[in-house]
Amino acid sequence: MASFNVPIIMDNGTGYSKLGYAGNDAPSYVFPTVIATRSAGASSGPAVSSKPSYMASKGSGHLSSKRATEDLDFFIGNDALKKASAGYSLDYPIRHGQIENWDHMERFWQQSLFKYLRCEPEDHYFLLTEPPLNPPENRENTAEIMFESFNCAGLYIAVQAVLALAASWTSSKVTDRSLTGTVVDSGDGVTHIIPVAEGYVIGSSIKTMPLAGRDVTYFVQSLLRDRNEPDSSLKTAERIKEECCYVCPDIVKEFSRFDREPDRYLKYASESITGHSTTIDVGFERFLAPEIFFNPEIASSDFLTPLPELVDNVVQSSPIDVRKGLYKNIVLSGGSTLFKNFGNRLQRDLKRIVDERIHRSEMLSGAKSGGVDVNVISHKRQRNAVWFGGSLLAQTPEFGSYCHTKADYEEYGASIARRYQIFGNSL
């Protein structure tokens, strides 16, 4: 891989995509995973073909010809959101972590590479990410697009949870650079609890919480509407979530403290879509909205299992010989784990569950237990943990040997993408 340029990391999530180069501390671009295409029957602009002309000719390989694809009538990211009411329809090609619209995903990657990163794919190795339990057919589709449409030099598809574990090594709380741990990954659309043992995901023990950042935003919005605030738009609710919300130690005590505060409402300035500035009151939604992770019944009648209990269930359903390692290294990943005191609350509640089980066991057996170390790791890379873990991996000299190359693809076909070597502890 020495003759190739710096590897490219692309982490495409349900809500946002992160793009950048290996070895960097942060992605170069972060924007929504959304594409705007011309609505059926809308006037002006050429129709977008299912496969742009440059993709049909493998030998072109010139940046100038590829940049001409910017003229195609579709937009991605923030540019797409701006076109929502201008005769374009929006589509989110990834739902709950899985790619559902491959045609739109291919176009999304096209502009990601040629408009934003402005790179020649044949000169770079790529690291792409995938959710746990991603169907092997999805890996094949990804490999086919990357090698056939973009002619990339090499490809590695990594499980997001493993990369998040690697990213946690930057925390001072991590004393052992191990790829054994439990990843709590909460983004915009869904929350996954994923146990990993020596770099391998324990697929049978993965559990999902259908509550995440978007649900917190909707909950904030509903509380604003209940008070008839002058601005209860989704955008304002999202800003309040990100800037004002926090996790409290005890919801009952927090309500009691809130009621005693004379200045209980924060004055929050927002700007409406018409450009007029308005002030709204932000009250108990600051601590009540993130509480849905710990008391989900306040927002959902379908899912009632709190996050700490779910994490405990994941560890207890894993092989007994790795359980201590899974409790000892619980790593937070994703923007929805960034609420103040989120990690402290999760560790306290989970420790309480574990200690109660140990106490019951001691009462029944009459023997004294040595206890279990429960450690929830928060770190400064949480928001972009998956991308940063990929950046760490791809900058190592060994990375090229983990990748499948264009020559491998041409010899064996897309099925080679079904398996990738676990990169172990070489970071």
Curated annotation (Swiss-Prot):
Gene3D superfamilies: 3.30.420.40, Actin, Chain A, domain 4. The gene is act2. Keywords: Actin-binding, ATP-binding, Cytoplasm, Cytoskeleton, Nucleotide-binding. It comes from the Eukaryota. Belongs to the actin family. ARP3 subfamily. SMART domains: ACTIN. Component of the Arp2/3 complex composed of arp2, act2, arc1/p41-ARC, arc2/p34-ARC, arc3/p21-ARC, arc4/p20-ARC and arc5/p16-ARC. GO terms for biological process: actin cortical patch organization; actin filament branching; actin filament polymerization; Arp2/3 complex-mediated actin nucleation; endocytosis. One of its GO terms (cellular component) is actin cortical patch. One of its GO terms (molecular function) is actin filament binding. Pfam families: Actin. The lineage of its organism: Eukaryota, Fungi, Dikarya, Ascomycota, Taphrinomycotina. Functions as ATP-binding component of the Arp2/3 complex which is involved in regulation of actin polymerization and together with an activating nucleation-promoting factor (NPF) mediates the formation of branched actin networks. Seems to contact the pointed end of the daughter actin filament. May be involved in cytokinesis. This is Actin-related protein 3. It is found in: Cytoplasm, Cytoskeleton, Actin patch.
